[in-house]
């Protein structure tokens, strides 16, 4: 619902909410969120390239990429001996970038009273 639209929007169906929770839970790790942001901003990359750029060991990064791939947030494609990762679609990058931008607007370490 928007401020100038008095008609309430319908609630999301429970299955969609459950899938959204799973998607957000998978993203909710600093390495995975950074990987998704990097792939959105810079495009496809190999595990080695990502590890070097992000300062993450290849074994740890492979574990995180497997989780992202299992949830269909990234796609892996073989290119000779290398495996190249890319976002499954741009919606993933938009969600990540919006979350990062929103957090930045709120200020580091700021916690809302609730």
Q: Would you name each region that the model predicts?
A:
Residues 1-19, 40-41, 89-114:
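Amphipathic alpha-helical dimerization/coiled-coil segments
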Residues 10-59, 79, 83-91:
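N-terminal helix-turn-helix DNA-binding core of bacterial DNA-binding proteins
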Residues 20, 70-71:
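A generic local structural motif
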Residues 52, 69-70:
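Alpha-helical residues within the helix-turn-helix
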Residues 64:
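Residues within the DNA-recognition helix of helix-turn-helix
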